């Protein structure tokens, strides 16, 4: 469950290491984001010479959350960290690699490029 001011790890090689959620997109008063949701975030930690610089405002999609996700079959899925992937204007990932597992709910949100780059889909 991601809300404003939540800090997330970045699960790609775009150059950012940590971001902070500014706004959850999708509706006028949407408070929480889950896996597959698009958020607006600010880059709080970045590596030098990366594609994404410190302080840049970016759109990201959440790929892992500590809060469990209930599937239709009754099973629960949760991860060890909150993580997101940075998107460009065409909703494709900025980075060329994805690190760590990605939840299957990202596929249902139609981010197929992220699913194809991910090493593991849970």
UniProtKB/Swiss-Prot annotation:
GO terms for molecular function: large ribosomal subunit rRNA binding; structural constituent of ribosome. It comes from Helicobacter pylori (strain J99 / ATCC 700824). This is Large ribosomal subunit protein uL14. InterPro entries: Ribosomal_uL14, Ribosomal_uL14_bac-type, Ribosomal_uL14_sf. It holds the Pfam family Ribosomal_L14. One of its GO terms (biological process) is translation. The gene is rplN. Binds to 23S rRNA. Forms part of two intersubunit bridges in the 70S ribosome. Keywords: Ribonucleoprotein, Ribosomal protein, RNA-binding, rRNA-binding. Gene3D superfamilies: Ribosomal protein L14 (2.40.150.20). Belongs to the universal ribosomal protein uL14 family.
């Amino acid at each position: 469950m991601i809300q404003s001011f939540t800090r997330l790890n970045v699960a790609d090689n775009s150059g950012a290491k940590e971001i902070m959620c500014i706004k959850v997109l999708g509706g006028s008063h949407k408070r929480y984001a889950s896996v597959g949701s698009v958020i607006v975030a600010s880059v709080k930690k970045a590596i030098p010479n990366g594609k994404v610089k410190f302080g840049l405002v970016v759109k990201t999609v959440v790929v892992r959350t500590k809060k469990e996700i209930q599937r239709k079959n009754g099973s629960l899925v949760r991860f060890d960290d909150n993580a997101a992937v940075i998107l460009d204007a065409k909703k494709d990932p900025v980075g060329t690699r994805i690190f760590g597992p990605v939840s299957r709910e990202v596929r249902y949100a139609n981010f197929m490029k992220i699913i194809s780059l991910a090493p593991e889909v849970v």
